[in-house]
Amino acid sequence: MSDAQDSRVGSMFGPYHLKRLLGRGGMGEVYEAEHTVKEWTVAVKLMTAEFSKDPVFRERMKREARIAGRLQEPHVVPIHDYGEVDGQMFLEMRLVEGTDLDSVLKRFGPLTPPRAVAIITQIASALDAAHADGVMHRDVKPQNILITRDDFAYLVDFGIASATTDEKLTQLGTAVGTWKYMAPERFSNDEVTYRADIYALACVLHECLTGAPPYRADSAGTLVSSHLMGPIPQPSAIRPGIPKAFDAVVARGMAKKPEDRYASAGDLALAAHEALSDPDQDHAADILRRSQESTLPAPPKPVPPPTMPATAMAPRQPPAPPVTPPGVQPAPKPSYTPPAQPGPAGQRPGPTGQPSWAPNSGPMPASGPTPTPQYYQGGGWGAPPSGGPSPWAQTPRKTNPWPLVAGAAAVVLVLVLGAIGIWIAIRPKPVQPPQPVAEERLSALLLNSSEVNAVMGSSSMQPGKPITSMDSSPVTVSLPDCQGALYTSQDPVYAGTGYTAINGLISSEPGDNYEHWVNQAVVAFPTADKARAFVQTSADKWKNCAGKTVTVTNKAKTYRWTFADVKGSPPTITVIDTQEGAEGWECQRAMSVANNVVVDVNACGYQITNQAGQIAAKIVDKVNKE
C-alpha cells in the first residue's frame, strides 16, 4: 500500500521512526516503524484522537491489551507494548508478512473446503486460547485474519476490538463491514459472551466456502434484521461441490441463541473437519502441517551429551506444555500468577534516564524470546504480496539473543504438530460429558461446619437455615452490573439465566459481633453449557468493576465498597471487596463452575486472602465426584 496523503511517514512518534503507512481505518492508522531504542522493526497502530480522548476506551484498551499480550498462541499476533505519546494511544505489534483473508477471497474467490477448514482450525485455536484467558475478540472477520504464503493463519487486533463498544463503532461508522459477522445478541440488550466470536467464526467459514458472507445487504438495517431473524444460509446450496455436511456446521455455529452454538471454537473446527470427505481430511491435515513447518524456525542441531558425570540438578527450564488438538478444551490455567516484586513505594524497577514518552508506556509481560520481526499487513491494511522477496526482508541489525531457546520451542511445536496430524487422522470419538447433577443432590455439595471453620481459621462458626431461593432483598447498588461481584445468589443477577434450583448456607460465629462470615451457594442449570455461559458473563461484568467504588443502599443504610482486580478466568474467578470505614473488613467473592453447577461463594473477615476460592474449589471437587 502506498503512503497516503497526510500520513506521518518519516516522522518520529516517541521512540518510533514511522517508515511506511500500512493502512487506515475508523480506529486509527497502522505504520511499519523502527523502534530506535530497541533497534527492531514493528507495526505500530496509532489510535484516532477521538478514541485516545475517550476515558472508557483508554482504560479498556489498557486492560485488554495487557491480557492479550499474555496470550501464548502461535496464531495470535502478539502485542509487544501499549501506551500513549503526547496523549495519543498506541499499540506495538509484531510485523507479520501476510495478506488478509478478505483480500485473498476477493482476488482468488472461494477457498477449497480443505483449505477453508485448515484456516478456520488455526483461527479457532487462537480464539480458544483467548477465551480460556477471559479475552473476547469481538471483531472476527476476514480483514482481521492474516494468511502467509504457506497458509499459516494469524488473528490480529486482540486488545483493540475488545476495548471498543458496539456503540462507539456505530458512531464512527466503521461497523458496517463488521456487522456482516456480528452475532444477534450484539444488536440487542442481551449479554454478549465468547460465543459471539464463535458465531463470527462460522460466518467466516461460510465466506471461505462460498466467497460471500452469509448475509449481504446494502444497509445496516437489513443486515441487522438478517442476523436477528433471517434463515441461516446453506453453503452447499450456494456453491456446487461443497459437502452438504457443512450446512449443519454453519447452522449450529450461527445459531440465533448463543447456548445453541458450539461450546468452543475448536468444537466448530472439529465439526468442519468431520464434514470433509476422507481424502479432503488428509489434505487439510497436510496444509496444517506444511504451514507450521514453513513458519516455525528450523530445529537446532542436536548437541552431543556432556561427558562429565551426571548430577542431580533440576532442569533449567520446565517442559513446554502440550498443545491441545482442535475441539479439545485445554486444562484450566492457574488462577493467579504472582507479579514481579515492586520497587520502593510500589514502583516497578526501571532504567534511569528514560525519555519523556516512557512513563505512559505499558510494556507487556515477558513471554520468552522475541521472534525475529516479520511484516504486518493485516486487517485489510495492505495489498496481497507481490512475487519475489519483499524489499524489507533483510536480516535485522540486532541478532536474536535466544536462538537455542527459540529453536527448542520450534522442536516442541513441530513435534506437537505431527501429533495433531495423527490425532486428526485417527479422529477419536469425543468423550461423553457427565450426566447433569440432580437438583436433590445440591445440598450434599455444600461444606459442613467443620470444613468451613477449617478454611476460615475459626472454631465456632455455625450454619443458619438452608437457602433454597435467590436473595431478592431490596438492595440498591450504584453500579447495578457490579451487584454480582459483591453479593452471592442475587435474584437480579440470576434472573432470566434459566437456572433451575439453588441451595445455600450462611455461616458465622453466634451473635452480631462475628469475625467470620460465609455465604456458600450452588446453583443448578439445565446444561453444563448454560452454567459455563453464566460464569463467562459474570467474569466480564466483574472485570468491568475492578478498581471501582460502589455505593450500596440497604434498609436505609448506605455503605461503600471498593473492588480489587479480578483474579483468574473461567472456570474460576475471584475478587476481593473492601468496605469503606469498616476497620479492614473485607470479603472475597469466588465463582466457579463444574458440570451444570455454578458455585457462588462469599467469604468475609478481617484477614481475607483466598478463603472463598478454597471453599469454591472444595465444592467443585464434590461436584466432580458426583
Swiss-Prot record:
Cytoplasmic compartment residues: 1-403
Physiological role: May regulate bacterial growth in response to external signals to facilitate adaptation to the host environment.
Post-translational changes noted in the entry: Autophosphorylated on threonine and serine residues. Dephosphorylated by PstP.
Active site: D139
Name of encoding gene: pknH
Principal location class: membrane
Lineage: Bacteria, Bacillati, Actinomycetota, Actinomycetes, Mycobacteriales
Location of the region described as Disordered in the Swiss-Prot/TrEMBL record: 292-396
Keywords on record: ATP-binding, Cell membrane, Disulfide bond, Kinase, Membrane, Nucleotide-binding, Phosphoprotein, Serine/threonine-protein kinase, Stress response, Transferase, Transmembrane, Transmembrane helix
Binding site for ATP: L22, G23, R24, G25, G26, M27, G28, E29, V30, K45
Modified residues (Phosphothreonine): T170
UniProt topological domain (Extracellular) ranges: 425-626
Protein name: Serine/threonine-protein kinase PknH
Composition bias type Low complexity, residue spans: 343-355
Signal peptide: none
Cell location: Cell membrane
Gene3D superfamilies from the UniProt entry: Phosphorylase Kinase, domain 1, PknH-like extracellular domain, Transferase(Phosphotransferase) domain 1
Biased composition (Pro residues): 297-308, 316-342
